[in-house]
Amino acid sequence: MTTLRLLISDSYDPWFNLAVEECIFRQMPATQRVLFLWRNADTVVIGRAQNPWKECNTRRMEEDNVRLARRSSGGGAVFHDLGNTCFTFMAGKPEYDKTISTAIVLNALNALGVTAEASGRNDLVVKTPEGDRKVSGSAYRETKDRGFHHGTLLLNADLSRLANYLNPDKKKLQAKGIASVRGRVANLVELLPGITHEHICDAITEAFFSHYGERVEAEIISPDKTPDLPNFAETFARQSSWEWNFGQAPAFTHLLDERFIWGGVELHFDVEKGHITRTQVFTDSLNPAPLEALAGRLQGCLYRADMLQQECDALLVDFPEQEKELRELSAWIARAVR
């Protein structure tokens, strides 16, 4: 009986793919070696301990329908589109060894005609006249009895979009999250014109089989049919939830300030697990009462634009004379936290 398992996703949904990865990892036998191949449509994927408001231009992501997905491994933020090929290697301990999976990817690239090498803890680079350029980044996760190594290969990614979503707005954030390290990157298509996702997947699969001396039929994972994986529905619900993708951010402080015709406003938010734990308001408005009331209402509120706007709008009942000012305030806060 083979000890290998090969899964290929035909979904471009990052929440679906990460839920599949999580379910396989949890339920795989300790003796199994798994290769999972997948890719995501426009998505920013952040590390387990990162703060999306710090790492990402969340406002532009919303405008461009770019999803946010938090993975269960550490590391930094990356932008995925269909020009990325994603891979995950899993194994039980003591079999799990990320140097083996790294070697498999390097062997796959070599078979395609690309000479790459490992650089630092997480990257694969190619030599060019301009210097080393990164073609792959990885992250890792280990539990007591198993581990996985997942990463991306830049195939034909739209590199111009990296800066659109990974360079955050100049927000006044003081956060404990891990800042992403930006590096010089290259697409494999620059080195191998005409290379496709299927070529990469075939090469990694062959290198995987060659290393272990076994072969196995691929299992195609599709969103058209719920995967036969234990607790998949619950895992997908969690992976796609605001509470996981945003609410798991490390504690941080966000300072907003704006000058309106009716006065200047400074808001200091302390946020933990996606909820506001404290709001301080400073203003030179002649009528600070609505703002003072807002500070009280926001205690415990989800740090989400629609929820903050809802609390601002609720003040209209108690302060109808300040409707114009409150609507301006509401719109500004919603824009600022997106």
Curated annotation (Swiss-Prot):
One of its GO terms (biological process) is protein modification process. Residues 29-216 form the BPL/LPL catalytic domain. It is an enzyme of class 6 (ligase). Its EC number is 6.3.1.20. It catalyses: L-lysyl-[lipoyl-carrier protein] + (R)-lipoate + ATP = N(6)-[(R)-lipoyl]-L-lysyl-[lipoyl-carrier protein] + AMP + diphosphate + H(+). ATP binds at R71, G76, A77, V78, F79, K134. It is found in: Cytoplasm. InterPro entries: aa-tRNA-synth_II/BPL/LPL (IPR045864), BPL_LPL_catalytic (IPR004143), Lipoate_ligase_A (IPR023741), Lipoate_protein_ligase_C (IPR019491), LipoylTrfase_LipoateP_Ligase (IPR004562). The keyword ATP-binding applies. (R)-lipoate binds at K134. GO terms for cellular component: cytosol. Pfam families: Lip_prot_lig_C, LplA-B_cat. Belongs to the LplA family. In the transfer reaction, the free carboxyl group of lipoic acid is attached via an amide linkage to the epsilon-amino group of a specific lysine residue of lipoyl domains of lipoate-dependent enzymes. Catalyzes both the ATP-dependent activation of exogenously supplied lipoate to lipoyl-AMP and the transfer of the activated lipoyl onto the lipoyl domains of lipoate-dependent enzymes. This is Lipoate-protein ligase A. It comes from Citrobacter koseri (strain ATCC BAA-895 / CDC 4225-83 / SGSC4696). The gene is lplA.
